Amino acid sequence: MAGRHGRIPLRRYRPRAAAPRSSSLIVWLHGGAFSHGDLDMPEAHGVALALAEAGHPVVTVDYRRVPSWSWWARPRPGVLGGVRYPVPVDDVSDVIGQLAGEAAASGHSLVLGGASAGACLAAGATLRALREGRAASRRLLLAYGTFHAVLPPASPELRARIRGRHGLAQFRPATVERMNRNYAGRIEAMADPFAFPGGHDLAGMPQTLLLDADRDSLRASGEHFARELRADGVDATHHVVAGSTHGFLNRPGEPAFDEGIARAKRWLVSA
């Protein structure tokens, strides 16, 4: 698909003829800390296959990714070069703008979803479309996303879930800040509501399902975002997949993958 920054690779998944016809066209964004991931990873391909098998047409998006970053070293000061915000959000916005017409013509309702960094891009692109008066998704499906420039404090319950050996592979607040700064490219962009919608005015956002991992420090952002959505009058459902860790949709065959997909399927046909 043509976008303002060039071609945007897409992959389409069509349900089998025998599958029940869905009223939703799902656009799905993989994660990867804004810097990694592709259309072949299970978090893209596996999720799309599972949803298509349930009768939903799915489009996965290979949005432009920012350069790799270090978990330990702070980004250099100043403006970072290369692909940075808003380019990935622009790609998502361009895809949604073009697919909205296709969805309407085929009688489908557009659902935008994503996992981890992809969830942030989905939320940011939707908020921008609403504020700019452009076509936006009718519903949002967000899995273990990070929506805040600075990771919110974890609840006592979450802290207990990521204690001890469960804390070894967690995203620390400083790590999240490095990841987000690398994506933002400029200090000023860290406060941009379309880069990190958490903590900003979310009134008018569409009905949203948030799926979070149980033992995942990033759940603090998902839980806060769900509360912020509800406080602004948005119909937001939040569910924690018991026993799961970050990235469970990238691991087909695990019980958490199956539960996450099952929750998404039920929600998609609930309205």
Name each model-derived stretch.
Residues 1-271:
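Alpha/beta-hydrolase superfamily serine-hydrolase fold, recognizing
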